[in-house]
Amino acid sequence: MKVLIASGAGGGTAKKSIGKYFHLQEFGKALEKLGVEYKLVRETEYVTGFPSKNVKGWISKKKFHSLIKEYKPDIVFCDCQSHFALETIKLGIPCFTYLRGNRWMEVEWAKKTIYKDPLMKTVLEMRQKIAERVFSECQGIFMTADYLDKVIKEHIPNAKTFHFLEGLDASRWYPEEGMELKHPCVGMCQDANWWGKTKEMLTLDQVIKQMPDVHFYWAGDGQYKKPILEILEKYDNFHYLGTLDYPDGVRKYLTEIDIYALPTGMDTTPLSCREAMAMKKPIIGTKVGGIPEMIYDNKSGFLVEEGNYKAWINNIRLFLDDKELSKKIGDGARKLLLEKFNWDVVAKKFVVVAESHLAHKN
């Protein structure tokens, strides 16, 4: 079986969003262990279509068709619901897509915030129509958190959904010196790409204010960076690092922080949190979306309710004061990662689904 993997999802705290491409490569290698041939490409290098900034791509699909003709994939796996997936479907090639978050909620927040302009709203709606068609006509949707199943079925009732808890090669995540931070410290490593998710970072306003002896670091970027920095940068114990080199810069950062924090208004099973788990970091995260599927309260981290800054303060102080507890929770986080977020397990599940579809097709 030959699988063509198309990487197109944006976002992420690594420069140029390389993190998502990097981990799809790990997925491909796990497929190879099972005797499956794979090819990983960046979808925008082959097809973009309208609407996009690449005007030439609106018309020409030559590179895409050449790729398909030369590689002859049995299955195409896309992590973005855009033109690559759509053109694959048009050619009648079995296509599976991967959903990392609540796309519909992200779109609604975008309309309320950065896409208020009529033109940009139109662009957003056009992109969403393409995504809806991909969701409706593809052979199945792999989802990164169980809670997304209900979300998907609300919008695409007949969709075939499959659990796909994105893996992580824990061997790549080991202590590496090289970054100097002030201690004690709490580290965040997340993007600010839609307000429904990002606004929860403002809960830390009172946390940072009331914990002047603790330093707070944020690595990440995104269109909502400015309103966050306007509030948090007034504190001397808050430090913004921007984007980090991947994976080395992120690994050095996670090595140095004392606690990993995930304040979020909506998320699934974020990559940076899995990386922190691999590094045995004690974790505190907001109890929303798919976060409880990776942070088991009092076992692999602590969960707090949205807006509850007092819980943040109490849990941070608890971790800092009780080193034995911090180590226990950190060890529990890595153990859970190895058991649940394993590429070999994910690859086997994918192959079962793909082969079942091909057998039924033939």
Q: What residue ranges belong to the model's regions?
A:
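Acceptor-binding helix/loop patch of EC 2.4 sugar-transfer enzymes
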Residues: V47-F50, F96-K129, K182
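Membrane-proximal helix-turn-helix segments that form the acceptor-binding/catalytic region
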Residues: K62, S66, L119-I141
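Nucleotide-activated donor-binding/catalytic signature segment of Leloir-type glycosyltransferases, i.e.
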Residues: K226-L244
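Aromatic "clamp/platform" in nucleotide-sugar-dependent glycosyltransferases that forms part
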Residues: G265
